[in-house]
Design a protein with these regions (language model features):
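Rossmann-like dinucleotide-binding domain that binds NAD(P)(H)
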Residues: 1-59, 146
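A general structural signal for well-ordered alpha-helical segments in protein cores
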Residues: 3-4, 123-128, 155
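Hydrophobic residues in alpha-helical segments
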Residues: 10, 134-135, 161-162
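C-terminal glycine/acidic-rich active-site capping loop/insertion
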Residues: 17, 36, 41, 70-142, ...
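C-terminal interaction segments
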Residues: 149-152
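Short arginine-rich
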Residues: 154-164
Length: 175
């Protein structure tokens, strides 16, 4: 559900259907250790999530790529302070958190530019945003109970799709 939440949060798109292929390669494992999920979003966009515990040398690598009609963005967990932006007919642009003109990207950073934010510190930002929301009624930027329910529906549909031979499963009627 973490990957589903990341895709939904970053893209602001709502998943409509999924088609999954989950595999258990390592003998004795109770859960799948490799999987790919094709996604159809409302509005016509398409995507996929690939997750593997057998991809040698990847060491919990997380990356996100979004392609649109005007360009694309790419972010990698291994270089969390960088965002690559490609626009049709333009040179590649590299944005770094904390850089000039990046105040919105720097809001949740406590260290000056050039210092990577830690994975654990990201959770403190979720809690801070949660309490700010309670105090001031600001628009929430943290996962809600409904996001959790949506994540569970996603997982149920993914497992069912794989068990039934990688058929498309609807997420409609959801949260």
């Amino acid at each position: 559900s973490h990957a589903e939440n990341l895709v939904s949060y970053v893209s602001s798109l709502e998943m409509k259907e999924v088609c999954a292929d989950l595999t258990r390669f390592v003998p004795g494992r109770r859960l799948d250790d490799d999987g790919t999920v094709l996604i159809r979003f409302r509005g016509g966009a398409k995507g996929y999530i690939s997750a593997s515990q057998i991809a040698v040398g990847r060491e919990n690598d997380i990356s996100l790529e979004i392609y649109g009609t005007q360009g694309s963005i790419e972010w990698k967990h291994s270089d969390p302070n960088s965002l690559l932006f490609r626009s049709n007919g333009e040179p590649l642009k590299l944005y770094r958190s904390g850089g000039p003109g990046e105040e919105s990207a720097s809001r949740d950073h406590r260290l000056p530019a050039g210092h990577p934010e830690g994975f654990i510190e990201a959770f403190s930002e979720i809690y801070r945003n949660f309490f700010e929301n309670i105090r001031g009624g600001a628009q929430p930027t943290f996962p809600s109970v409904l996001d959790g329910v949506r994540g569970m529906r996603f997982l149920e549909a993914v497992v069912a799709s794989s068990e039934e031979g990688s058929v498309w499963k609807s997420l409609e009627g959801g949260v």
